[in-house]
């Protein structure tokens, strides 16, 4: 009786070095989000389905791979025009902030993004310190400057510690909505846009109230409700 020929395995597509590197970063992102940063490169290579020497050809150390994950997951989204959106004074500040936080939360409100961020904080890695600096300099400082401009205050001096703390309270409240929903799986207001809108009303009114003593006499207050 004639034996059936075993089916041929489909040939695996040979990846270019750049595509292979991207694949490693994508799989490492999944690995770090599920397992944290405690494992060694041997476990990581096994999870990626490659040998340790091959992984080392692309990333000489685990720290190098972590830095690349940080760059692709946390820094690349800032190249999408967010900074221009925040500083476009042809539009009311409230509209700009609403649009920004809707776009921003579409990126960070994923289980993967949040887990990596929280794991890195527990492990004491630099990712959190780097990202906190990015948020402070590229987001919160700009928001404070735009709030000052809207209120008729000087915009060229650095944000004060009090201004930054108020901005952090506002920003962190939105961030923690994502933690409650995607990490704790707790009930939240499902209308995310409404949550952002409510937070903006409180922040803009609070900024006006806390720092309004510095306003020029007769200046119209910022509009909280759009």
Each language-model region and where it sits:
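N-terminal intrinsically disordered/low-complexity leader segments
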Residues: 1-19, 85, 211-226
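Hydrophobic/aromatic residues within well-ordered alpha-helical segments
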Residues: 20, 62, 69, 73-74, ...
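Helix-turn-helix
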Residues: 23, 27, 31-68
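Amphipathic alpha-helical segments that line or abut small-molecule/effector binding pockets
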Residues: 26, 94-109, 114-119, 164, ...
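Amphipathic alpha-helical linker/stalk segments
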Residues: 69-99
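Short secondary-structure transition hinges
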Residues: 83, 88-89, 95, 106-144, ...
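Amphipathic alpha-helical packing segments from all-alpha helical-bundle domains
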Residues: 126-153, 165-168, 197, 201
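Hydrophobic alpha-helical segments that form the core
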Residues: 140, 156-183, 191-206
């Amino acid at each position: 009786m004639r034996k059936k020929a075993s089916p041929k395995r489909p040939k695996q597509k040979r990846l270019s070095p750049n595509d292979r590197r991207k694949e490693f970063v994508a799989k490492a992102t999944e690995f770090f989000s599920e397992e944290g940063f405690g494992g060694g490169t041997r476990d990581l290579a096994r999870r990626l389905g490659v040998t340790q020497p091959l992984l080392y050809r692309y990333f000489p150390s685990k720290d190098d791979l972590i830095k690349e994950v940080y760059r692709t997951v946390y820094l690349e989204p800032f190249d999408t025009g967010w900074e221009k959106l925040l500083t476009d004074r042809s539009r009311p500040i409230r509209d700009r902030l609403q649009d920004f936080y809707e776009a921003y939360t579409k990126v960070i409100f994923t289980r993967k993004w949040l887990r990596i961020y929280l794991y890195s904080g527990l492990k004491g890695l630099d990712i959190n310190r780097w990202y906190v600096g990015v948020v402070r300099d590229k987001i919160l400082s700009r928001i404070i400057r735009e709030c000052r401009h809207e209120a008729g205050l000087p915009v060229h001096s650095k944000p004060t510690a009090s201004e930054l703390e108020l901005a952090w309270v506002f920003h962190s409240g939105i961030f923690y909505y994502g933690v409650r929903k995607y990490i704790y799986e707790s009930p939240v207001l499902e209308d995310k846009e409404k949550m952002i809108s409510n937070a903006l009303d409180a922040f803009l009114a609070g900024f006006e109230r806390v720092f309004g003593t510095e306003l020029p006499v007769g200046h119209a207050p910022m509009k909280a409700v759009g």
